[in-house]
Amino acid sequence: MYDLQKVIVIGAGPAGLAAAIRLAQHNKLNPVIYELRNPDAAGIGGSLGIPANGLRVLYRLGLWDMMLRRGVEISKTILHSAAGSILREVDVATEPKQQTGFGYFRINRVDLVQCLRDAAQERQIPIHYGKQLTSIDEHGGDRVTVTFSDGTSDTASLLLGCDGIHSTVRRLYVDPEMKPVYSGFGAISAIVDDVDSHERKDATCLHSTITPQGMLATAPCAANQTFWFFSKEVPLPPATDSGDERDGWSLYRQNELAAWRSSLSSVLDCMQGQWGQYMRQLVGSSKDLHFYPHYRLPLGGRWFVPSGSGRDSPRTLLLGDAAHAVQPHAGQGVALAVEDVLLLSGLLTQYQAGEYTALEEVFGRFDRIRRPRIEQINELASRNGRMRRNQSPWLVWFKEWYMWFMLHINWFWGMSMSGVSNGDILYDVEAELK
């Protein structure tokens, strides 16, 4: 029997905010959001790419017009050789727009989060910051209580874990054995203001080059702002006394940033032509560099605790990266998270209409629908990530030739930008509800 009223959302990133907004406006539920970090830290991050499948969901959430003022629509992706020549220009907007109404969009993470916060505030959704979750208790199958380190607690009929790849909801309750694994790759990046580009006619393009040391790419992310990153293989740092890999990365950031600058400098020195000149100018204008190691969650993890595990009917579900974080190399992280949100909302509508008799049936259907897509995107991300491996100059030359050849036939085989199939970016999660 449908008995949902209040929803607790753990995490005030894109997944958590989108979930609260959708469940409030479409399902008429009463969400409340709890976030570990303070408001400034909760919005940190670099630039995000969102393909058509994610943009369509964000439009249905009523966010598109707000986002459009803060980001940039990308028209094409341009692949450069290290020698400076253009290997191929690929239109990434026309066909998706014709079929979905949307193309490919880039926006700073902090701006996307602010759009979501503004939308949540318009709907009077409370957001509590600085709340460290310490325990989760499901009571008799009809409610769930969360307790925080400051001694406060809250109870609702549904709990959504939207707290990212290092999810506390997953660690404390849903799947304690599931741990993030390191992909072997990391990236250094920066957002640069007001780069002189008066001679360039491609201010709405994403540019990339594969080098022997990794991949270098850049794209606009806001008015008068450009994002660039250098992604390469990075060994796992030595473990610290705490046993937490994140502590090792913290030390790595402090000690190895100079080595990254040196590696990047050698890459830039080998790049020629106008493209190389522009990238040296862009990197030289960067003030704040950030390093991020890329983690993912192994496939097969649990997204809810089934009643057959000795517990009552479940009231807790993981969404977004908390459930299925993939490497960023498919450009689908935000899109997958908001797809989760739209699907859950639709299933809860069907639950209210009597198509399901228990919340566990809703969770089970959600799981069966999402698993194949997550597996597909995970494989794509892993495959794209391997292009960042260290390699000889001769192998880079061969790959440049191979990509030139493949990009000429991708559209014939139904492929678009960087090997992402049209089926991936034209996917409509709401069609799964029919």
Region spans (language model):
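FAD-dependent flavoprotein oxygenase/oxidase catalytic domain
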Residues: 1-434
